Amino acid sequence: MADVGRCDYKKDILPREDSVIDMVRVATYVHQMPSAIEMIEDAKSKGYEVTCNIMAISNTQESDLDQALDMVAKSSADGIYIVDSYGALYPEQIRRTADKYTEIAEANGKFVGMHAHNNQQLAFANTIEAAARGVSLLDATMMGMGRGAGNCAMELLLSFLKNPKYNVFPVLKFIEEHMLP
């Protein structure tokens, strides 16, 4: 993740062939969108898959979010992330937001991701709601470990998805052996 205004992206983000990462997430607030677009274009030109994580959308005016989404839609970003930075959104808000993001993303050949925080213990519910609305990349961490109240718990998400390509048992084993006292 590269936060707008917090890194020297032209120097810090190496060309893809010299790096161990494949994706750059540009984290931004709506008022920083022009700088975010510059970072997106720079990372894309260096060979990365690039997403735009528009943060703090629960504190953002709808018109400002619409303008930011329009800017990302016109950029070379591969994806747009719904980011509930403060864990303040309810499932019905995620539903509307996911529909808006998905409509814009599909019209512009992009995917949508979800990054939820757990301040109201809704990160899991909101991630599931986003998935039900067509969001394809779902962020989760072991035991929900993350900033503040944490994120969506990976072990819950993997169990819920019931997809045979996902095996929750190695995650549970890691948690038991390395995270629990």
Residues of each region from the PLM?
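Catalytic cores and adjacent flexible loops of soluble metabolic enzymes
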Residues: 1-181
